[in-house]
Amino acid sequence: MSIKKDYDVIVVGAGSMGMAAGYYLSKQGVKTLLVDSFHPPHTNGSHHGDTRIIRHAYGEGREYVPFALRAQELWYELEKETHHKIFTKTGVLVFGPKGEAPFVAETMEAAKEHSLDVDLLEGSEINKRWPGVTVPENYNAIFEKNSGVLFSENCIRAYRELAEANGAKVLTYTPVEDFEIAEDFVKIQTAYGSFTASKLIVSMGAWNSKLLSKLNIEIPLQPYRQVVGFFECDEKKYSNTHGYPAFMVEVPTGIYYGFPSFGGCGLKIGYHTYGQKIDPDTINREFGIYPEDEGNIRKFLETYMPGATGELKSGDVCMYTKTPDEHFVIDLHPQFSNVAIAAGFSGHGFKFSSVVGETLSQLAVTGKTEHDISIFSINRPALKQKETI
């Protein structure tokens, strides 16, 4: 194959974060090469399954709110630039038992601190407003009106098309075999030969856990197998067209998340947990191989959304890549300021991929970013742990 060998920036891993970075680099006229082991968007990483929730009031920590709001701005901008559908404002409903749901409580505090437009609801109000939901009286909720659903594969598809239109090159089905780094020079080795640049962005998803060591970086990253299911439901209660929102629910058995039915696809639901530890190269991608793949989420639906317990229409398997504290890693390499790292998004990263891409592009071009990414430092104490939970 014939492809130029020297670039300003090479992006290794052209999934959620990397493809966004490639777009923002190419938009500035930066000569960019994106290299991926597959053909993004694809079904081998953490971005497939059609949809992802974007929340602004953030139960994982109110420090994320400005990052989430900037991500939303960028998603709106992307939608203006492409013919692909990027975002639908469904609203996001977060609920759980009052006084026993710290995720819900932090979501409410984040909304209050940042003056977000939300409704606070009691159990009976939840049941009345959304007849598809059945919750006890002692539950409360926060409904965030301006949040909603991102169409994840479309997001990556749009970023790729726009980046390529700007002159970026995307090299697919090309695993990176090795890296060579100096202060103002990087080289990657692939089956198609070597490629060089002055800057490098590494965003390899679950494969960060295996390959960052080649860059002399040791971060405790653990990939996990994650599943979602699509269930037949009462479309008049659970469809987007009838006003059903995306949701996050914290109950005694854990945290669940889901989406309204779009175009009859069924209600989509997942159990936000860290299940089987896996190797991304050998993960079993067959939904239903474990009884709990369907069992856990069906049991939740039977209790809280009984009109969505029809036949399983389909199921998907993807991956979470967890850090010990479940916060991201977005930073420069400790020894080489010409290398930026994005890793460990711990099952809640996709919504931020627009702003992460912007941040990575800024780090690559100027060595700094306008965004506060101190919580994502590669040098934070939590990353000194040898084992993940």
From Swiss-Prot:
Domain of life, source organism: Bacteria
Residues annotated as binding FAD: 8-38
Impact after mutating residue 14 to I/V: Decrease in activity
Outcome following mutation: residue 265 to R/S: Almost no change in activity. Stabilizes SoxA against chemicals and metal ions
In-chain residues carrying the UniProt-annotated modification S-8alpha-FAD cysteine: 318
GO cellular component terms, A-Z: cytoplasm
Keyword Cytoplasm: yes
Effect of substituting residue 13 to A: Loss of activity
Impact when changing residue 15 to A: Loss of activity
InterPro entries xref list: FAD-dep_OxRdtase, FAD/NAD-bd_sf, MTOX, SoxA_mon
Catalytic activity: sarcosine + O2 + H2O = formaldehyde + glycine + H2O2
TM annotation in the entry: none
Principal EC category: oxidoreductase
Subcellular location: Cytoplasm
SUPFAM superfamilies: FAD-linked reductases, C-terminal domain, FAD/NAD(P)-binding domain
Alphabetically ordered keywords of this record: Cytoplasm, FAD, Flavoprotein, Oxidoreductase
MF (Gene Ontology): flavin adenine dinucleotide binding; sarcosine oxidase activity
Gene3D superfamilies, alphabetized: D-Amino Acid Oxidase, subunit A, domain 2 (3.30.9.10), FAD/NAD(P)-binding domain (3.50.50.60)
Cofactor: binding details: Binds 1 FAD per subunit.
Function: Catalyzes the oxidative demethylation of sarcosine.
Similarity annotation: Belongs to the MSOX/MTOX family. MSOX subfamily.
NCBIfam families the UniProt entry points to: PRK11259.1, soxA_mon
Assembly, per entry: Monomer.
Misc remark: Decreases in function by replacement in the G-X-G-X-X-G motif are suppressed by chloride or bromide ion.
Protein name, as recorded: Monomeric sarcosine oxidase
Species the sequence originates in: Arthrobacter sp. (strain TE1826)
